[in-house]
Structures are given as C-alpha cells and as structure tokens.
A protein has these predicted regions:
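Short, Lys/Arg-enriched N-terminal segments with co-localized hydrophobic residues
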Residues: 1-9
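Extended beta-strand/beta-hairpin segments
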Residues: 44-50, 137-138
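A short mixed-secondary-structure module that forms the rim of ligand-binding clefts
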Residues: 73-92
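C-terminal binding/interaction regions
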Residues: 9-41, 88, 94-169
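A short glycine/serine-rich beta->alpha loop
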Residues: 69-76, 108-113
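Short beta-strand scaffold segments in enzyme catalytic cores
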Residues: 51-60
Length: 169
C-alpha cells in the first residue's frame, strides 16, 4: 500500500496601495476648490448621535459638483455615509456623466491625526462607479489643515473588492 502525500503550494498575491501626502498649497486649484466644497457640506451633516460629521464633494466630467454629507438615524444602521449620499446623487441625477474626483473631509469634536478612510460599504460603492464608467476616480482625503492624502484611484483603498464576475457563476 502506498501512502500519498499531498503538497499544497502556497502562493502570495500582493497589491500595493499608494496614497500621496500633500500640503494644501501643493494641490491644484480644482482639488483645493473641491476640498472647500466638502468642508462646506460637512458643516450641515446630520450627526446628532456620533457628533462625527463627514462631507464629500465630487466633480463630474461636465464640471458639475455634487455634494453629500452623512445623515444619521437613531435606528442604526438606517443612516447613510456622505460618500454614498454624493455618489448615489450623481448616479441618479447625472447617470451618464463620469465622476473624476471625490474629496472627503471629517469634522469631529476631537483632533484628527490620520486620514479618515471611507467605510467598506462606501469603498465598494465607489469602486462600482469606477468600474461602471471605465475610468479611475481620484480620491482626496483631508486629515487636518496640514495633511491631505490623494490616491489616483478608489481601488487603492479596496484592492480586493467584490467583483461582479462572482455573481455570474
């Protein structure tokens, strides 16, 4: 009787994610303007429970700016994040327009030291639009007055996103 040994070869899959850090004055005027719009809409976020306000502004290829702020609800998780408010607004009202950039900012009653990243649901929603339009969406994240992080693509924030091919099986 022969004994069989099964060998499993482990393979490593690696994806590198890049965020570039800038100072405000190093950004171009369009990026600075989009960040300001995100701050403006952040101030009207409805966040009475978390006291953590988030604003998102995106710009379409036709130069239309769409804003969104988080909208909380006492019946968690019935609220919606700023990123999805903005991106779904764009999808509903400008379905054939390309989203070029999205700026995301947060205001809290404590000092923010690191970039506030979009939640997984928002990352997946933004990836869906990036894939749908066949063009990268630049993402701009402002941490505080000094530090701003930029990624050329939302996919850098969710390198192993759920793929639509998985639904076809």
């Amino acid at each position: 009787m022969h004994k069989f040994r099964y060998f499993y070869i482990m393979r490593t899959h690696e994806i590198n994610s890049v965020l570039i850090e800038y100072k405000l004055e190093e950004l171009n005027k369009n990026q600075q303007n989009l960040l300001q719009k995100a701050h403006d809409i952040c101030s009207v976020a409805y966040a009475p429970y978390s006291m953590f306000k988030v604003g998102a502004s995106l710009i379409l290829k036709n130069k239309q700016i769409i804003n969104g702020s988080n909208q909380e609800n006492v019946a968690y998780p019935s609220g919606l994040c700023a990123e999805r408010v903005a991106i779904f607004n764009a999808g509903a009202n400008f379905p054939n327009q390309i989203i070029e950039q999205i700026a995301i900012v947060a205001h809290a009653n404590f000092e923010l030291k690191k970039p506030i990243m979009p939640c997984g649901a928002c990352r997946q929603a933004m990836i869906e639009y990036e894939r749908k339009q066949g063009q990268k969406i630049e993402i701009i994240l402002q941490v505080n007055k000094e530090n701003i992080f930029v990624s050329e693509s939302v996919s850098n924030l969710l390198p192993y996103a759920f793929e639509c091919e998985e639904l076809k099986k």
